[in-house]
């Protein structure tokens, strides 16, 4: 499913600020795998995710996803195949748009490659059904702006948006690090449930051993 071979990335090469973030890294995930990478801040975890997502190109090595070489595929094309959650709950959603509009944008983009298509009543009912599974009452607030939600609610919504249409790969980049412990545990439980139910191939990074134990028990 995901195959990375000899990936290397150096920032500011040839200067006093040169930093080798990745060095000949190889990694393989089979379809349906849930793999967690544990490392301290600055260990290159987010650099790896940025390389996979296409935020920049690696200096050396190759990346393939579902049998397709994506090493030099533009970021916007990769985003149709790869879902991603960030540490900051404010990323991944549009605060001035409603919950329903955010879900529609994610759904139409993933399903049709066109975020400006129309959504049907059937689609709206599907959104409400999916929101209900989060157990946060968001199905009754679909007309509310996302900016009114708490950090935990926004992160749960982003998780749902990333998985409405099953992605080839889901990247979880310290996605509970900014949440309080109780909320983080709830979002992790939702993550584990959604990933297992939809059999999503998933790569998560964290520096928190407790969160690692929660997701893999």
For each feature predicted by the language model, list its residue ranges:
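A short, flexible loop at the N-terminus of ABC-type nucleotide-binding domains that lies
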Residues: 1, 10-24, 74
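ABC ATPase NBD coupling module
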Residues: 15, 69-83, 91, 113-120
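The feature captures the beta-strand-to-loop junction immediately N-terminal to the Walker
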Residues: 38-40
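Helix-to-loop junction immediately C-terminal to a conserved catalytic motif
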Residues: 53
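Conserved ABC transporter NBD signature motif
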Residues: 61-69
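ABC ATPase C-loop
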Residues: 162-163
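H-loop/switch region of ABC-family ATPase nucleotide-binding domains
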Residues: 206-207
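Conserved small/polar residues in nucleotide/adenosyl-binding loops
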Residues: 216-217
């Amino acid at each position: 499913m995901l195959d990375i071979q000899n990936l290397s990335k150096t920032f500011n090469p040839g200067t006093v600020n040169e930093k080798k973030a990745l060095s000949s890294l190889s990694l393989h995930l089979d379809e349906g795998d849930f793999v967690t990478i544990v490392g301290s801040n600055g260990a290159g975890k987010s650099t790896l995710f940025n390389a996979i997502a296409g935020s920049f190109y690696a200096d050396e090595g190759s990346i393939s996803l579902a049998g397709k070489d994506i090493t030099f595929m533009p970021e916007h094309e990769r985003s149709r195949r790869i879902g991603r959650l960030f540490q900051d709950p404010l990323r991944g959603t549009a605060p001035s748009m409603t919950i329903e509009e955010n879900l529609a944008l994610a759904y139409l983009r993933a399903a049709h490659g066109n975020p400006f298509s129309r959504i049907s009543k059937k689609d709206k009912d599907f959104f409400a059904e999916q929101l209900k599974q989060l157990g946060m009452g968001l199905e009754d607030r679909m007309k509310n702006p996302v900016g009114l939600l708490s950090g935990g609610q926004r992160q749960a919504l982003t998780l749902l948006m990333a998985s409405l249409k099953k992605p080839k790969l889901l990247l979880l980049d310290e996605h509970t690090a900014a949440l309080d412990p109780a909320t983080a545990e709830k979002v992790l439980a939702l993550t584990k449930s959604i990933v297992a139910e939809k059999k999503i191939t998933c790569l998560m990074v964290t520096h928190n051993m407790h969160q690692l134990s929660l997701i893999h028990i």
